[in-house]
Design a protein with these regions (language model features):
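C-terminal interaction-tip segments
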Residues: 1-29, 46-48, 197-199, 205-213
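Intrinsically disordered, low-complexity Pro/Gly/Ser/Thr-rich segments with frequent PxxP/GP/PP motifs
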Residues: 50-56, 171-201
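Asparagine-centered strand-capping/turn motif at beta-strand->loop junctions
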Residues: 21-24, 35-42, 143, 204-206
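Short acidic, flexible loop segments centered on an aromatic residue
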Residues: 37-57, 206-208
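Short solvent-exposed strand-capping/beta-turn motif centered on an Asx-Ser/Thr pair
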Residues: 36-41, 89, 97-101, 207-209
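Noncatalytic modules at the cell exterior or secretory-pathway interfaces
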Residues: 32-33, 147-153, 193-208
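Extracytoplasmic copper-binding redox domains, predominantly the cupredoxin/blue-copper superfamily
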Residues: 57-170
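Extended extracellular/luminal ectodomain segments enriched in beta-structured repeat modules
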Residues: 24-32, 87-93
């Protein structure tokens, strides 16, 4: 017999929330229904999207990346200079507060060529806050339709510390769907179903804070 389970997300807002929380699907699963309910007294828009199983998808899955330095390499979320896959339409925050950055006089940055060759530093949609290597320092990167398909993260002072960033599209099941106050949007009802693969992630997002169940 087939097992069924129900997973609930509460008070989803503008930051995408994933099911299972902070994890990939660990097997091929069948999804037979998705219910997106507006918990507010105002109309909202809501989205549901998938990210596919690919190398290093666990890095930046929550749109936050912790940056440290070890062995002459940038370490991102515990992995040594991994290639990154980022999704268009979202903003990623790189935590660059670790003293392993400042102690080696490293500077984390983006470029359109490896190691920032040929003065190729990339600053479009990039916002830096604080001083790298000190508390609360961060860099945000807004990935849009105009972001180059391939970028690089690198150290402005030392070569060979970074890797590639690939910008790609998330797979939307529904995008910016209007949901009136007190109403819900139901997907896949009526016998329809969707099979997700091991390693996939499913995200939900609302146009306003804490408005989607």
């Amino acid at each position: 017999a087939q097992d069924f389970e129900r997973t609930k997300l509460t008070a989803v807002g503008t930051t995408p929330s994933d099911i299972p929380t902070s994890a990939d699907f660990d097997s091929d699963d069948t999804i037979i229904g998705i219910n997106m309910a507006n918990r507010t007294a105002n109309s909202i828009t809501a989205s549901c999207f998938m990210t596919s199983n690919q190398a290093n998808d666990d890095i930046a899955f929550d749109f936050n990346i912790t940056v440290t330095v070890a062995g002459g390499n940038f370490i991102l979320d515990g992995q040594t200079k991994p290639a990154l896959v980022l999704y268009r339409g979202f903003t990623y925050t790189f935590d660059v507060s670790s003293n392993t950055i400042s102690s080696g006089s490293h500077v984390f940055a983006f470029a359109t060529e490896a190691d920032g060759a040929n003065s190729s530093g990339y600053t479009t949609g990039v916002t830096a806050t604080g001083t790298q290597g000190q508390a609360n320092a961060k860099i945000t990167l807004q990935v849009t339709d105009s972001t180059p398909e391939t970028l690089y993260y690198y150290c402005t002072a030392h070569s060979g510390m970074g890797n590639t960033i690939t910008s790609t599209n998330a797979h939307f099941i529904v995008k910016d769907a209007p949901i009136p106050a007190g109403s819900a949007l139901q997907l896949l009802d009526g016998g329809a179903k969707m099979v997700v693969q091991n390693g996939d992630r499913m995200f939900f997002q609302s146009s306003t804070a804490s408005s989607l169940d």
